Amino acid sequence: MPIATPEVYAEMLGQAKQNSYAFPAINCTSSETVNAAIKGFADAGSDGIIQFSTGGAEFGSGLGVKDMVTGAVALAEFTHVIAAKYPVNVALHTDHCPKDKLDSYVRPLLAISAQRVSKGGNPLFQSHMWDGSAVPIDENLAIAQELLKAAAAAKIILEIEIGVVGGEEDGVANEINEKLYTSPEDFEKTIEALGAGEHGKYLLAATFGNVHGVYKPGNVKLRPDILAQGQQVAAAKLGLPADAKPFDFVFHGGSGSLKSEIEEALRYGVVKMNVDTDTQYAFTRPIAGHMFTNYDGVLKVDGEVGVKKVYDPRSYLKKAEASMSQRVVQACNDLHCAGKSLTH
């Protein structure tokens, strides 16, 4: 299918929330990882989200360019072409963008999509993330208001983060402590600043103990009840029934989470879960195995010439793609979106 239109993307998220499932958002950095993600979605019979971080986008532009916008556009255009050959919907998103990179990443990408929409087309991306977790909440939400207006004009959904996700991603490290839980006051301020969709649709990455990186199951102290509290605060603020779920939540830092915690988060309105660390390992593991198994073929040892068919990058990248695709299928199963593509 062609990349999801704004209307299809909104329907994807709406169905997920209504039926208590979520979509994996797979961080990609190359054509190989994009191929792996889309194949995984298709194998699972699920729609899905592909996203590029600032570092991933820069990597995607190559060592000679090293430009985030160039890489994001190139990877997005590639995804548009490949996704059209598959029978599921794929949406494009950009991951964490801090304040110091807004002018060199999200704002230029918003401008590109706005230009496309002004000519009667669809945006290049379906959503962008503004990560204001490093600045005071009032400044975070003031910037979010400005970006939400620009995003809505370009038919794009904005993702924001309130609270801090622990661990490390793209070289940005955050401590793991009691600050990793979004407060009721911050949920209320979010509703006051951004509303409940009337100023533009947004996704909320609230923090409930999330940690980026690699952790053994059980070592991440998640409190999904924080999300339930957030929904209750928002419902009360908006005068809605107590069981209403005004927020569309995003689950960051899911590696090492227990399945029971994921299940609970889904009940409280999570519609998108970021997956990066686990798919990175799934991609790299068969490459490592290939190198160990064929070390005397991939290396020119003791004056020998090696074996071309095993140092041909295709020989191990195919294995990497297949392994990562399998991990994407697992993510779809864990989030209960498998078999639920809107195309079915």
UniProtKB/Swiss-Prot annotation:
D-glyceraldehyde 3-phosphate binds at S53. Zn(2+) 1 binds at H96, H212, H252. It catalyses: beta-D-fructose 1,6-bisphosphate = D-glyceraldehyde 3-phosphate + dihydroxyacetone phosphate. Keywords: Glycolysis, Lyase, Metal-binding, Zinc. GO terms for cellular component: cytosol; extracellular region; peptidoglycan-based cell wall; plasma membrane. Binds 2 Zn(2+) ions per subunit. One is catalytic and the other provides a structural contribution. Pfam families: F_bP_aldolase. SUPFAM superfamilies: Aldolase (SSF51569). Gene3D superfamilies: Aldolase class I (3.20.20.70). Zn(2+) 2 binds at D131, E161. InterPro entries: Aldolase_TIM, FBA_II, Fruct_bisP_bact. Pathway: Carbohydrate degradation; glycolysis; D-glyceraldehyde 3-phosphate and glycerone phosphate from D-glucose: step 4/4. One of its GO terms (molecular function) is zinc ion binding. Dihydroxyacetone phosphate binds at G213, G253, G254, S255, N274, V275, D276, T277. This is Fructose-bisphosphate aldolase. It comes from Mycobacterium tuberculosis (strain ATCC 25618 / H37Rv).
